[in-house]
Amino acid sequence: MKRMSPARAIAYGLPGLATLFTFTMFTTYGLYFFTNVVGLSGSFAGLIMTIGTLWDAVTDPLVGILSDNRDPKKGRRRPFLLTCAVPFGIVTWLLFTTWDFVESRQKIYFIVVALLFYTFQTLIDVPYTSLSGEVTDDYDLRSKLATIRTFWAIIGVAIGGGIMTYTAFLEPVVGGIKQAWSVCFALFGFICTISILIGYKASEGYENQNISVKKSYSIKEMIEGPFRNKPFLHLTIAFIFAILAQAIFLGVLVYYLTYNLNLNDTQVSLVNIIMWIVALFWVFPIDHWSTKYSKVTSWIISMGIWLLCMIIFPLFFLKPGSTMAPIIMTSILVVGLNALYQVIYSMISDCVEVDELVSGERREGLFYSMATVSQKIAAAIGVSILGMVIDYVGYDPLASVQSISTLEGFQNIFVIGTSVCLLLSIITMSTNPLTKKRYSEVLQALQLKRTGQNISLDEFKDLLFLKKRSM
């Protein structure tokens, strides 16, 4: 495979700023925007993401299969980036823009825009992440490319972390808080479009044009491929629990900092900005753990640190009015938020090779689309639960001081909800059978298979659910 220079690899990772940044911003601030800025109920705000996710359950696999089956000579992945870059930027702006509609039309508007947002994110994210499997089959280089992609995403989130301060500053300038949010996300949308187009240009010449393409998949094949792949099942379940933890943690963080710890908008922005700036430095230890030990080990260490912070800091250090304790806590636990994408997306490409042992085809689009469906379903479930909890505990967005039961509700979902999900993620990933050594053995077997030699799948029973042979 063609070697990618460091400068090109850095440019290649830029679309991660668009897709991961917007998804994280929507997960972190979407609920707050809908409840406190637009004035919708927490339950309906959660419903918006749920509807978008149900739509994703259809579109993600379709886009994955569509990109897998395109003519390799014309490009299977890159054309999606060029076509969807501008619409994605526009929809990002519209998602955080409210108009003078009556409430019923306002609800319909946000449902439609959310569907468009999820659609264009899928049309970019699935082909783009699938492309990494064609760029290289090197275990460590895939980790480095995922590191660069995550690095750019964190830069975006670090900039976006100051949204509370930006909107407060812009409010008197543009004529209101709603207009301030719209202006901020118009700028974010423009940045996303530019980053996608740069990634499109940087990836030129790196699509594999010599891949055999199967024109269609049956529903049975769509299900069989991922579900017989043991490493993929382990990482997907671990991913789901970790995304649930992320959705709960980030979704309630603004409320927790504002009401439980009595921080103002500037202090809340400061905590978020510093957290994501420090996150830039965590990408290097994560990459080191992945290449020196294994991606599974890197995941367990990162999520373990996050889990410990969720237990220790609320018990002993977080006090109302203190800014330093939450800054220290989030600066440490953000290693887990980094690993969530940095580790998992490099592992999916490894699972594609395991599938190729049986199918004889490279189906990155199918596997990445199944992973993104899992990601969005988990996020929607997390935000929906959070929205219902916010309503259940009696949250009043017009009150500067919340009731004791509301504060206890925020505390419980923040600490217990996040911690339980993290623990389940660690347990699931720790039993993943695809070690660095086993991956090397998979590559060796594939090299033999590609030259026409027979291989025994029985040697890979720990990685695949194999059909029993009839006597």
PLM region descriptions:
Residues 1-471:
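Membrane-embedded alpha-helical bundles of multi-pass transporters/translocases
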